[in-house]
Every structure is written in structure tokens, then in C-alpha cells.
Amino acid sequence: MAQLLMVTVTLGCISLLYLLPGTLSGSLGKGLRHSRPREPPAKIPSSNLQPGHPSLQPVVWKSRRHAPQPQGRGNRALAMVHLPQGGGSRHPGPQRPTGSRRPHAQLLRVGCVLGTCQVQNLSHRLWQLVRPAGRRDSAPVDPSSPHSYG
């Protein structure tokens, strides 16, 4: 059972590698293709660059449609895939309405500044201050001591 799971995961990873641009060329026996190093993103855009200038667009976020195609030999299975240039879909059939859907696996950050430990420490401190007066620790809570915060 474990071997079947391992084979399934391995084949899934290999097929995902073939879908990524520039990771494998040809078959598995030909080896890996060396990729070019990425350009660092522009830190501060200068005033003489136009908004559509290519140096303002990070390389990581470019769509595969607009990325330059490598010259020479490539994966023939990937070369057969036609990427439409006019914004159409490469999947035939009925079109689904595309809305602003968020991916399920990615969490959105909503601006919480406090970390988990800070929230736990503040909760513990609040509990220390408002807990019932019947049961107290042997030592009183010292607000200036870092040990009284958690």
C-alpha cells in the first residue's frame, strides 16, 4: 500500500515538473536544462521609465503566454500545446464565467500585526488581571516583571 502511494506521488511530481516551463527538456534520459538566473526586481522605479516598461514588471509574475519561447530543442509534448494570443481559452467547450475567485490554498493576510505568541501572552495577562479574587497565586503579579506576561 505504501509503495503504491509512493509511486503515485512520484508520478504526480514528475508530471508537474513537465508542466513547469524551463524545468525539463526532452525525456528523462536527456537530463535537466540549465536555466538563466533571474533578474532582481526593480527597487525604485525611475521617473524616465514608462508604466509598461519591461523592467518594471517582475519576471516571476509574467504570464507564460508573453514569456519568450526558448530557441532550440524542447519537449515535443509541450510544443504541441497551442497557447492562444488573443486572450482566448486553450480548453475547448463551454466557457464558465470568470469572477474574482480566491484560491482555496492561499490565505489572505488582513493586516493583523500581533503574532500568535503575543496574542497568547496578552490573553494570559488579561486573565491574570480579571480572574476571580478567591484563588490567587502565592506571589502577586508584578507588571514590571517579564515573567508575569506568560
From Swiss-Prot:
Origin: domain of life:
Eukaryota
Q: What is one GO cellular-component annotation here?
A: extracellular space
Which positions are cleaved off as the propeptide during maturation? 26-100
What molecular function terms (GO) are annotated for this protein?
hormone activity; protein-containing complex binding
Annotated S-S bridges: 112-117
Signal peptide positions (record): 1-25
Q: Which residues carry this modification: Tyrosine amide?
A: 149
The UniProt annotation puts the region (Disordered) at: 28-102
Q: Which residues cross the membrane?
A: none
Annotated site, Required for CALCRL receptor interaction, chain positions: 109, 116, 121
Q: Which UniProt keywords apply?
A: Amidation, Cleavage on pair of basic residues, Disulfide bond, Hormone, Secreted, Signal
Please give the chief subcellular localization of this protein: secreted
Cellular localisation: Secreted
GO BP annotations of the record are: adenylate cyclase-activating G protein-coupled receptor signaling pathway; adrenomedullin receptor signaling pathway; angiogenesis; feeding behavior; negative regulation of blood pressure; positive regulation of angiogenesis; positive regulation of gene expression
Tissues of expression: High expression detected in the submaxillary gland, kidney, stomach, and mesentery, followed by the pituitary, lung, pancreas, intestines, spleen, thymus and ovary. Expressed mainly in the intermediate lobe of the pituitary, with sporadic in the anterior lobe.
Provide the function of this protein: Intermedin/ADM2 is a peptide hormone that plays a role as physiological regulator of gastrointestinal and cardiovascular bioactivities mediated by the CALCRL-RAMPs receptor complexes. Activates the cAMP-dependent pathway through interaction with CALCRL-RAMP3 receptor complex.
Q: Which family does it belong to?
A: Belongs to the adrenomedullin family.
Supply the name of the protein. Answer: Protein ADM2
Taxonomic placement: Eukaryota, Metazoa, Chordata, Craniata, Vertebrata
**Coding gene?**
Adm2
